[in-house]
Amino acid sequence: MKKFALLAGLFVFAPMTWAQDYNIKNGLPSETYITCAEANEMAKTDSAQVAEIVAVMGNASVASRDLKIEQSPELSAKVVEKLNQVCAKDPQMLLITAIDDTMRAIGKK
């Protein structure tokens, strides 16, 4: 099974820059439609952009589900490891779904 390495330092809670100017009448942001495989390819050339996308989606999942995430030095590695597992099962899964599954697995209500 191919491992998706979305970068060990990928999950850093970043500001929500691409979500700030969102207007539903303009449709969903294009980042919403990125698959795990596409994010993996994109990370090879623009890891900062992928890190930001993952952080924004992760924050949205945590906030909308009111999850409690215990901050620790291992958090980034734990999130990336779980995200890689989820993406490896279905590389064509939307990244936002994979991140939501990951955050629900790590977080607590």
Swiss-Prot record:
InterPro entries: YmgD (IPR032497), YmgD_sf (IPR038304). Residues 1-19 form the signal peptide. It comes from the Bacteria. GO terms for cellular component: outer membrane-bounded periplasmic space. Keywords: Signal. This is Uncharacterized protein YmgD. It comes from Escherichia coli (strain K12). The gene is ymgD.
